Amino acid sequence: MDLDAIRAKVASGQYIVAFSHTEKLRRRRIRAQDIEEAVRLGAVIEDYPDDPRGASCLILGMAGRRPLHVVCGCLDAEEILIVTAYEPDPREWENDWKTRKKRF
């Protein structure tokens, strides 16, 4: 997915958060401003072009000093879908928050 296009849509408010995850975001204390900042400053670390729900990607960004993973998908030409956002779990991610730990 095109990060510049995602950033432009998020910056202009052309995004929605998946209804099924709004409560999870509230419990995780992740605000819309946190998502916007993470996308604005972040980088795509994984691409999911074959996602059955439609092409999506995983963005790593910072909200203040807090690392966030934001999963974005394409709804249509008008809006970006924020599928979910979460703090990466150190048991699953290396210290760079970009690299998944190897499972044995």
Q: Predicted segment positions?
A:
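Ribonuclease/tRNase effector modules and their secretory precursors
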Residues: 1-104
